[in-house]
From Swiss-Prot:
NAD(+) binds at residues 22-23, 43-44. This is Siroheme synthase. Gene3D superfamilies: Cobalt-precorrin-4 Transmethylase, Domain 1, Methyltransferase, Cobalt-precorrin-4 Transmethylase, Domain 2, NAD(P)-binding Rossmann-like Domain, Sirohaem synthase, dimerisation domain, Siroheme synthase, domain 2. Keywords: Cobalamin biosynthesis, Lyase, Methyltransferase, Multifunctional enzyme, NAD, Oxidoreductase, Phosphoprotein, Porphyrin biosynthesis, S-adenosyl-L-methionine, Transferase. The keyword Phosphoprotein applies. Residues 1-203 are annotated as: Precorrin-2 dehydrogenase /sirohydrochlorin ferrochelatase. It catalyses: uroporphyrinogen III + 2 S-adenosyl-L-methionine = precorrin-2 + 2 S-adenosyl-L-homocysteine + H(+); precorrin-2 + NAD(+) = sirohydrochlorin + NADH + 2 H(+); siroheme + 2 H(+) = sirohydrochlorin + Fe(2+). Residues 216-465 are annotated as: Uroporphyrinogen-III C-methyltransferase. Pfam families: CysG_dimeriser, NAD_binding_7, Sirohm_synth_M, TP_methylase. Pathway: Cofactor biosynthesis; adenosylcobalamin biosynthesis; precorrin-2 from uroporphyrinogen III: step 1/1; Cofactor biosynthesis; adenosylcobalamin biosynthesis; sirohydrochlorin from precorrin-2: step 1/1; Porphyrin-containing compound metabolism; siroheme biosynthesis; precorrin-2 from uroporphyrinogen III: step 1/1; Porphyrin-containing compound metabolism; siroheme biosynthesis; siroheme from sirohydrochlorin: step 1/1. PANTHER family: SIROHEME SYNTHASE, SIROHEME SYNTHASE-RELATED. The modification Phosphoserine is found at residue 128. S-adenosyl-L-methionine binds at residues 225, 301-303, 306, 331-332, 383, 412.
Amino acid sequence: MEYLPLFHNLKGRTVLIVGGGEIALRKARLLSEAGARLRVVAPSIEAQLVELVQAGAGECLDRGYARQDLQGCVLAIAATDDEPLNATVSQHANALGVPVNVVDSPQLCSVIFPAIVDRSPLVVAVSSGGDAPVLARLIRARIETWIPAAYGQLAGLAKQFRAQVKARFANVQQRRVFWEEVFQGPIAEQALAGRTAEAERLLAEKLAGVAPKALGEVYLVGAGPGDPDLLTFRALRLMQQADVVLYDRLVAPAIIDLCRRDADRIYVGKQRADHAVPQEQINQQLVTLAKQGKRVLRLKGGDPFIFGRGGEEIEELAAHGVPFQVVPGITAASGCAAYAGIPLTHRDHAQSVRFVTGHLKDGSCDLPWSELAAPAQTLVFYMGLVGLPVICQQLIAHGRSAETPAALVQQGTTSNQRVFTATLGTLAGRIAQEDVQAPTLLIVGEVVQLREKLAWFEGAQAAGR
């Protein structure tokens, strides 16, 4: 090991930065976050750097570096493009026993800056010893995805109770077991969900020896339109810890595969005129499973609150006192339009956008057609494949031009995506000649014409243009 990792308490202590440019500013920001008092020396200092230093009660010296600038400093940073000056700062600092870092010159450094993942008070540092800083940053980026931002709250909870736990358990082994149970159980889940008061209550009860009750919970998670890369970090974390998964027809198989492998999987999908499981039964099933102490993942395509009946499900949970979390997902309108190269709003074409259900009931759509036919707006119809001819006819009948551009997106954001473009007057006829597979999304408006120059996600699906 070439360098020993240490964490330095810089609160209120003076750090010298030689240099007044962008590199010095980046170092100053990091040091300021650690509570250091900054002394910046350079003939010319950027305004942002001056402002940052003054906000932290530091000092800016508008002149060249002098050896005495190191007096009283616990760390020195050379951040200039003047190599002889950087070498001089390093030499002086080493002679005085002051740790020194010279940017991009590891051979002149007695200390180096790692790549940092900050979940204060939890901090992770990654270093290559200055040999491969880009690699260290790439590893840091991966760690950023593994450690939720809320872990800082969890670490803060541990700090709050540390003294009490130490007083309760004199044995180090007992304390270790206690904290492992906390960090891997429902107390941690409450903290990560932002329910700090509940986490504190449960932790206090655990310290007092109160037997915990089986604490079930429902995670209502939006799975997005299909591409697994569009899942949120929070969604993925909950997917990988649930005991049982209830999933819809619109959830892509690649996303279901990301769920915890030993979790029970229950299909509750619906399709037109065929509800495999009635909604009321789904609601009750969520309540029953959660009251058994299970962590229940309710996985829905798109966003659970946009034509997903998620509101009905959590109403039932709330009525029965079942804890729940809601994780929004990228709704099909946003995801499919973006992957099709169709901006839903545009200053020159559409000043508003409306999301509408295209689901037919008794062969018709009960919609405010006169409002929908107004110009300068984009319409997005969910579940509109079967009702496509009726939708196009009604919009034209109520005043929308038959020449209005329209697009039908099949299985958007996935490798099976196909985009069919035409006009309101011709789209239904074109779709009748194609083998279109649900799920689909219908987009109507002048913005559709922008696809000709903005389409980017094509590949094998280009044949559907």
